[in-house]
Amino acid sequence: TDKSAIDMWTKELIHQHIDRSLTRMKTDYLDLVQLHSCSKEILERGEVIEALLEAQTAGKTRFVGYSGDNEAAVWAVNSGYFDTLQTSFSIPDQHARTNLFEPAHARKMGIITKRPIANGAWRSAINPTANLRYRPMRVYGDEYFRRAQLMAGLGPISGEPEDRFLTAIGFVLAHSDVTTAIVGTQNPSHMQDNIERVKHGSSLLSTIVEELQRRFDRLDDDWGQLT
């Protein structure tokens, strides 16, 4: 981590950001304040954690959390300082299942999964031509798509829903350690549609969940979490 990156993560700046959020939201306290994707090195310095705990003691936030992946997320979970973990988890990004869920659950942390549908990678991988408009465009989206293609290439899965969104979100929600999942959208109608689809069809057969886990484990070639 270079000096400029470290200088972004100071106790003073953390306090400034929390106070600014309180002012903007016109509230006396926040329910949750999370550190987003700071490195393991910065966590180990302790300054940002001290800032969060001071804010919590002062009543400015009820809970404190860490949002991130891989070794930094492992450190955050094992530290015992955080109430929540927000981390990447999806069909083509499953390392949280083997590295994070169990220790986080043991510490009674809330687990918030980010990118649960992986930019639509599973839907696109099944039929790339027909679903071209769903093709992930960001760099990490391309990696999701590559992994999903490899997993889908092992053949059809018996009983899988025709709507591959339900496969993607159902896979994440099938893991009992998951507290909630964040599905990003810029369109309120898409959000409402997603809610209705989850209400009426997100439960997956255990055989489908197990097959998707098996495929990831079989193909995993150091497929680390994508931040």
Give, region by region, the residue ranges found by the protein language model:
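Hydrophobic/aromatic residues located in beta-strands of well-ordered beta-sheets
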Residues: T1, F63-V64, I111, A181
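Glycine/proline-rich, positively charged
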Residues: D2-H95, N99, A174
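Structured C-terminal cap/extension of enzyme domains
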Residues: S79, N99-T227
